[in-house]
């Protein structure tokens, strides 16, 4: 059993059934034995990018998380401290939060981001 944390692009690719999402990631996300989490940071990132016109995404993503059988992952004060303490390999604050959450909660990040593995977290290629 895996505990997966979806990076924003992996979450959106899953919802859209996009061909960009690789077979291994698709199988792992769809495997009911695995726990799949979507971070509050992902909701925040999507909302900001939608508001500034950089992303078109459905409005009801919160419900889509639940309909997909995924779990919400809240951001805690500890996660915030951990994200701030990370080395500056990656400046994206949303990805830094996902990294901190994955480290704290023992999660595998489903991502295509080449910077995330530099932090020593387990990843699965999206």
Located regions from the model:
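Short, well-structured N-terminal submotif of metal-dependent ribonuclease cores
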Residues: 1-38, 51-63, 105, 114, ...
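A generic structural signal for short
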Residues: 13-14, 49-50, 86-87, 101
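Phosphate/NTP-binding elements of NTP-utilizing enzymes
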Residues: 46
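Active-site neighborhoods of divalent-metal-dependent phosphate/nucleic-acid chemistry enzymes
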Residues: 56-62, 67-115, 124-126
